[in-house]
Each structure stands twice: as structure tokens, then as C-alpha cells.
């Protein structure tokens, strides 16, 4: 479904992508692949995803079907709100909840904490990603958290990552993980808060 969502995103953004240096050569934007063919690929991927989905319990199937509109409306968000990255996190981390439901056949606080934390993780890293295109996006009129927080990106990104790290700590606590888990958390803590946040150079496309 994620691949199908990416195709739908590229179809929806094809006119915008043509105007952005980094994305102008994407297959659909550059017309190497027609919109019709891309749509066929998306349908095929959806069918494959459905064939996989029907092997799970009914609760998982229902919850997965509920999430489908999210995947197909995400591409529109950048036209209306400065928070498309938040919507991306809500959409593409939904699989965390589905994975839990497929095994436990119920929803508990643990996957919800993890889901919310992962949503902030996506919000952080996709905000960084957005700085590659910020100059083109501002000219075109596309919205993003990269633009909204362009004057103080490090604080916002650090905040997102701190929420994510707190969620990992809480999940470990709720699942009674031993001390090795918390020691292991030092690695993402250093990577996210130092190398991805404090040392971030938003003016450098390569750094983003």
C-alpha cells in the first residue's frame, strides 16, 4: 500500500514536480511513464495488498480499510496546510498499529504510544527532507513544516525527536524490557539529537 500511495502522490504532484529541480526528472513528472500506466500500477499494488490483507483477522482487515483514504489524500495536504509532514506520519506509521492488531486482535496503549512517537519521528525527518526543495516550494506556493519553521528548524526537529525517544522509553517500560533496551536507546538519541538536529545545515541540500 505504501508503494501505491507513493504512485498516487507522484500522479497528484506531477505538475508541481516539474517545477522543482530535485523532482523534475521523476518518471511521471517527466512523462517517461504516463498517468494511465502509473494508475494501473497503483491498482495492481492495491490488489496485491488486498490479497495479503484478507489473510489476517477481521479486525485487522477493518482497521486497514479505514486507513486507505489517508494514503490517497496525503498528496493534497501540501496545498492546504503547513503540516503535510504530520499527515504523512499519521498515514505511513499506521502499519505499526495494524501489525499489533494482526497478532493481538486488539488495540492497547502500547502500539498507540509507539504510533504517536513514530508520527513525530516522521514529522522530524521529513521536515529535514523538505529543506532540499524549500526555495522552489516557496516560489510555487507549496506548504510544509520546513517553511513554517525555517527560522528555527533545529528546535522544532529536536522537539519531534524527543517525543519519539520518549515514546520508545515508554514502550520499553510498558513491555518490561530489561536494561539492555535502554542502553541501546543511547544510539538513536545521539544520532537524532546531535547528528540530525544540532549539526543540521538546512542551507545544504546534501545535508538534508
How does the language model describe each region?
Residues 26-113, 194-201:
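Intramembrane alpha-helical segments
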Residues 2-8, 70-76, 94-98, 116-131, ...:
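Transmembrane alpha-helical segments that form the membrane-embedded catalytic/substrate-channel core
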Amino acid at each position: 500500500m505504501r508503494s501505491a500511495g507513493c504512485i498516487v502522490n507522484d500522479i497528484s504532484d506531477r505538475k508541481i514536480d516539474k517545477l522543482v529541480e530535485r523532482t523534475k526528472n521523476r518518471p511521471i513528472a517527466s512523462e517517461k511513464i504516463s498517468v494511465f500506466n502509473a494508475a494501473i500500477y497503483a491498482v495492481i499494488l492495491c490488489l496485491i495488498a488486498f490479497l495479503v490483507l484478507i489473510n489476517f483477522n477481521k479486525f485487522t482487515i477493518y482497521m486497514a480499510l479505514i486507513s486507505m483514504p489517508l494514503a490517497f489524500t496525503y498528496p493534497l495536504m501540501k496545498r492546504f496546510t503547513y503540516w503535510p509532514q504530520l499527515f504523512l506520519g499519521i498515514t505511513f506509521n499506521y502499519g505499526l498499529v495494524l501489525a499489533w492488531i494482526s497478532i493481538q486482535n486488539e488495540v492497547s496503549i502500547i502500539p498507540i504510544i509507539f504510533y504517536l512517537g513514530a508520527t513525530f519521528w516522521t514529522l522530524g525527518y521529513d521536515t529535514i527532507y523538505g529543506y532540499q526543495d524549500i526555495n522552489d516550494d516557496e516560489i510555487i506556493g507549496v506548504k510544509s513544516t520546513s517553511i513554517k519553521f525555517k527560522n528555527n528548524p533545529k528546535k522544532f526537529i529536536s522537539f519531534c525527536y524527543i517525543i519519539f525517544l520518549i515514546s520508545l522509553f515508554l514502550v520499553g517500560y510498558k513491555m518490561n524490557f530489561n536494561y539492555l533496551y535502554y542502553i541501546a536507546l543511547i544510539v538513536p538519541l545521539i544520532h537524532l539529537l546531535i547528528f540530525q538536529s544540532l549539526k543540521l545545515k538546512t542551507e545544504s541540500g546534501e545535508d538534508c
